[in-house]
Curated annotation (Swiss-Prot):
Residues the record lists as binding Zn(2+) 1: D311, H315, H456
Region span, Disordered: 1-20
Name of protein: Alkaline phosphatase
Sequence intervals crossing the membrane: 27-47
Active site (UniProt): S115
Species, as recorded: Schizosaccharomyces pombe (strain 972 / ATCC 24843)
Family to which this protein belongs: Belongs to the alkaline phosphatase family.
GO terms (BP aspect): nicotinamide nucleotide metabolic process
UniProt xrefs under InterPro entries: Alkaline_phosphatase, Alkaline_phosphatase_AS, Alkaline_phosphatase_core_sf
Highest taxon of the lineage: Eukaryota
GO cellular component: fungal-type vacuole; fungal-type vacuole membrane
């Protein structure tokens, strides 16, 4: 009787194994063993080769662009303005083709963020309280993407149109419990912090924070000479004017370019012989960083670019300066985009928040509103509101009325002013803040542009991308997700840097007005326009 373990059917060929079959089995075993050995050798060869030749990897480039204070309305206004100015119906801004999503901007302390908390969300990939510069809610410093990149062997750069110690650049390169501790921020930027120097290239304004208190143009509260420290201790090449910038060739890092005492000029007030534009600084920075990457076989670079004064124009409710700043930011974006398309990497552009509550359209009377706005008014303008307010304050009071009528109002796009406009400006003539408000309102009403605030708003802002980032960031996102992407993409550790910074100083004295007799507009933008 068959056992339960016996096969149901007879096995084919059952019986003694032939010699030829045994030989084939032996060859198969040897072949499999050989393949396994070869595979192991090949794996370890390539693994060790990869490790020993890490410098031959294709470098990674991350360009983070921040259009400070620019909201969706800014783009609508600028697009229509360019269409009118150049008779280009259907015109598209350079940014338009690269829209990938939108960002929510709240901070940990408010539904409406300030620039410091907004920038720290990008740099540390964490929410924090308004006013915090590279510092978390517990008032402990957090490692930034720029610092982590530098620690990992990348080159780093910052290009802005504000003081380099202002909230956004500071939040990537320094740590302060309050954004107005600009003495401390400048010290971090020249390498006096616990990590040493983290920034290889720094372009913008804000010279006053690097000069000792005894110096005429200083705004420091002490006598530290940070230019001397930067040059002698850290080897910075220092550029202080347009000539220095133009003569820059075969530049060696580190580079420190401080092209004004405070912020750089608005684009509409730009004097080419005095200081470079944002787009020029961006082009030079990219060239210098790329050349340095090729020469020292670094991993690549991280570059922060900020269109800082878009925000400041909106704080003033100045549609003239605002539209020209947005145009210049688009030129800078075009340069950065071309770089990434040629060399690879990731370009991210977004805003930290919207400023001003800008609306393209305004009800200017109690009657039912017209469905229009008038970009042609802005196209006639010659200067920013700050520039003209300063000019009024400094003008001979005996000839002020004709000056307002014949120069100031035509310079804001109103060639045929009415008596009320002239009167309102004249009444406000002694107070720079009142003048800015009056002038901004006159041109905004004339152009039918609306504003809801002189501060920030909670509106979501656009996110744009070029290169590999477009495969990872999509749709509506929290601002910290942008920082998280950069950390993963560059393969760096923010937490490791945070650990190194656990005893880093975050308290310092606020800056002070310098002794130099600057224009009222300089004082305004240096110490009051972006306090929100």
């Amino acid at each position: 009787m068959a056992s339960e373990r016996d096969p149901l059917l007879p096995v084919h060929g059952e019986g003694p194994e032939s010699p030829s079959r045994r030989n084939w089995k032996t060859w198969i075993k040897h072949g499999i063993l050989l393949i396994l050995v070869l595979s192991t050798v090949i794996f370890f060869y390539f693994f060790s080769s990869h490790k020993s030749k890490g410098t031959n990897e294709k470098p990674k480039f991350v360009i983070m662009m921040v259009s400070d204070g620019m909201g969706p309305g800014s783009l609508s206004m600028t697009r229509s303005f360019v269409e009118t100015l150049n008779d280009k119906e259907g015109y598209r801004l350079p940014l338009d083709e690269h829209l990938i999503g939108s960002s929510r901007t709240r901070s940990s302390s408010s539904l409406i963020t300030d620039s410091a908390a907004g920038a720290t969300a990008f740099s540390c990939a964490n929410k924090t309280y308004n006013g915090a510069v590279g510092v978390l809610d517990n008032e402990k410093p957090c490692g930034t993407i720029l610092e982590a990149a530098k620690e990992a062997g990348y080159l780093t750069g910052i290009v802005v149109t504000s003081r380099v110690t202002d909230a956004t650049p500071a939040s990537f390169s320094a740590h302060a419990a309050n954004r107005f501790m600009q003495d401390l921020i400048a010290e971090y930027q020249v390498g006096m912090g616990p990590l040493g120097r983290s920034v290889d290239l720094l372009f913008g304004g804000g010279l006053c924070s690097f000069l000792p208190k005894s110096t005429y143009r200083s705004c420091r509260s002490d006598n530290l000479d940070l230019l001397k420290y930067a040059r002698k201790k850290e080897g910075f090449q220092i550029l202080l004017n347009r000539t220095d910038f133009d003569e820059l060739s075969n530049a060696q890092l580190p580079l420190l370019g401080l092209f004004s005492d405070y912020h750089l000029s608005y684009d509409i007030d730009y004097q080419p012989e005095v200081q470079p534009k944002l787009s020029e600084m961006v082009e030079t920075a990219l060239d210098v960083l790329l050349n340095a990457t090729n020469e020292d076989t670094s991993k690549g670079f991280f570059l922060l670019i900020e269109g800082s004064r878009i925000d400041m124009a909106s704080h003033n409710n100045d549609p003239i300066a605002h539209v020209y700043e947005v145009m210049e930011y688009n030129r800078a974006f075009e340069i950065a985009s071309a770089f990434v398309e040629k060399n690879g990497g990731s370009l991210i552009s977004t805003s930290d928040h919207e400023t001003g509550g800008l609306t393209v359209g305004r009800q200017v009377s109690k009657k039912y509103p017209e469905y229009l706005w008038k970009p042609q008014v802005l196209s006639l303008a010659l200067h920013s509101i700050e520039y003209l307010a300063s000019a009024i304050v400094n003008h001979n009071q005996n000839t002020l009325l004709p000056y307002i009528e014949q120069f100031v109002l035509p310079a804001i796009g109103i060639p045929d002013p009415n008596p009320k406009q002239i009167h309102d400006i004249y009444v406000a003539r002694h107070n720079i803040f009142n003048l800015i408000n009056v002038l901004s309102d006159i041109v905004s009403v004339e152009a039918q542009i609306g504003w809801t605030t002189h501060g920030h708003t909670a509106v979501d802002v656009n996110v744009y991308g070029v290169g590999e980032v477009t495969e990872h960031l999509r749709g509506n996102m929290e601002n910290i997700e942008i920082g998280q992407f950069m950390e993963i993409y560059l393969n760096v550790s923010l937490s490791d840097v945070t650990e190194k910074l656990k005893d880093a100083p975050i308290h310092g004295a606020p800056d002070r007005p310098s002794l130099v007799e600057t224009s009222f507009s300089d004082r305004l933008v240096g110490f009051g326009a972006d306090l929100f």
